[in-house]
Amino acid sequence: MKQGQVLLLALLFMFLTGCTTTPPKDQGNLCSIYREYPDWYEDSLQMQSEYGTPLHVAMAIMKQESSYVADALPPRDYLLWVIPWGRVSSAYGYAQAQDPVWGEYKDNTGNGGSRDSFDDAIMFIGWYTTGTQRQLGISKWDTYNQYLAYHEGRGGFSRNSYRSKPWLMQVAQKVQKQSEIYSAQLKQCRQELEDDRSGWF
């Protein structure tokens, strides 16, 4: 391979990897997250305005699902416990939305979007939690049950599938606690974020 081709490939690799947003440095602090990525705050506000899902609820769900990794994938599945055999599901991106429900979201909203784009992923979570409230009567502020329905699907939640998964109920409690922490943190820095936001325009 010629030296020029090697250089071109190296530059292309650097460009592609540079386009990926790295996860926030302090994922446990919502103020730190929004300070690091102020556009995420703006995207979260747009989601809340359109769907009414509280920022701290949507962000707690996203943290649990992907740890804010843009191209997050579920664990690999294995044949005979050793041979890699695809992934355990089609979940992908910030919101870990699976192919069928992502397709439903795009059809219902007209949003082409991408699962590895934060603004599209946060809007998806808002859309899904709104549908859960409408279909199952679960408040958008009820992080615990919203997360169970998000993880199991609304049909699975209706069948109480989570009750046979004590580990999942513990995870849902963890997400609930994280949302409470996020909510308290946001109250401390909301004015600062709004002041910074007003300076953008």
Where are the model-predicted features located?
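Short, surface-exposed glycine/acidic/tryptophan-bearing loops
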Residues: 72-104, 147-149, 167
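C-terminal motif of bacterial Sec signal peptides marking the signal peptidase cleavage site
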Residues: 15-18
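Low-complexity, Gly/Ser/Thr/Pro-rich intrinsically disordered linker/tail segments
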Residues: 191-201
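Catalytic and substrate-binding regions of cell-wall glycan-acting enzymes that process beta-1,4-linked
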Residues: 84-88, 141-193
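Export/targeting segments at the very N-terminus of extracytoplasmic proteins
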Residues: 20-79, 133-136, 186
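Alpha-helical segment that forms one wall of the substrate-binding/catalytic cleft
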Residues: 94-145, 149-157, 175-176
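Second-shell loop/turn segments in exported
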Residues: 28-34, 44-51, 84-92, 107-119, ...
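Bacterial N-terminal signal peptides that target proteins for export
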Residues: 1-7
